[in-house]
From Swiss-Prot:
SUPFAM superfamilies: HSP20-like chaperones. PROSITE patterns: SHSP. Pfam families: HSP20. This is Small heat shock protein hspG8. Keywords: Stress response. Residues 33-211 form the sHSP domain. Residues 89-105, 124-139 have a biased composition (Low complexity). InterPro entries: A-crystallin/Hsp20_dom, HSP20-like_chaperone, HspG1-11-like. Gene3D superfamilies: 2.60.40.790. Residues 140-152 have a biased composition (Basic and acidic residues). Belongs to the small heat shock protein (HSP20) family. The keyword Nucleus does not apply.
Length: 211
């Protein structure tokens, strides 16, 4: 019968080397370009009647957490998003609203080509100079407005981590003992608890006759 040490052996081969553990569990294939930024700590406990998996996910909304079991592998993944203050949110909105639209980019195709200006260069050179001057003035005004809207907050310490997280747990050696229909999850105070009950009765052995 498999013990808790069997699944812990596949979970972490060296508890004293977190870097190697992260590199092993967070490695992705070439086709998957998702970068794992956070390796949340995990506790796994096997009791007489259930398997308990606890994962610390402080500062993460339950809407940003995904849990699934595929090919005997339990996967906990999601994203810890950075909270923006009102001033930073306003900057994001302004940048998105001032970005060039497709209609603006398409209108450049209707602008006259340089060959059309060659027929009458002198009169249009003055107009061109005036346009450049006006554009320069408008650009300076835009830069002044951007400087006014830049956040004035100064961050002295930044130790919190944000981004994607992912943890794997290989249940192959104990899966036959578990009742997957009894999976229960609870997320409270930043702690995700997954409970899987053991099967009440193992099936009786089946005798096979030889013909």
């Amino acid at each position: 019968m498999a013990t808790i040490f069997d699944i812990l052996n596949t979970l972490n081969n060296n508890n004293n080397n977190n870097f190697e553990n992260c590199k092993r569990q967070c490695s992705t294939n070439k086709s998957n370009k998702t970068i794992i930024d956070i390796l949340p700590p995990m506790d796994v406990t096997m009791t007489n009647d259930k398997l308990i998996i606890e994962t610390e996910l402080a500062g993460i909304s339950k809407d940003h957490i995904e849990i699934d079991i595929k090919d005997s592998i339990l996967t906990i993944q999601g994203e810890k998003k950075k909270n923006l203050n009102k001033q930073q949110q306003q900057l994001v909105i302004e940048k998105s609203s001032t970005s060039p639209s497709s209609s603006t980019l398409d209108s450049k195709e209707d602008e006259p080509s340089i060959e059309e200006f060659e027929d009458d260069i002198k009169p249009k050179s003055t107009t061109s100079t005036t346009t450049v001057s006006t554009t320069t003035t408008a650009t300076k005004e835009n830069k002044e407005d951007e400087n006014k809207t830049k956040p004035t907050d100064k961050k002295f310490i930044s130790e919190r981590s944000f981004g994607n997280f992912k943890r794997y747990l290989d249940l192959t050696k104990v899966l036959y003992q578990l009742d997957l229909n009894s999976i229960n999850t609870q997320f409270e105070n930043g702690l995700l608890t997954i409970t899987i009950n053991k099967k009440l009765h193992y099936p009786n052995p089946i005798k096979i006759n030889i013909n």
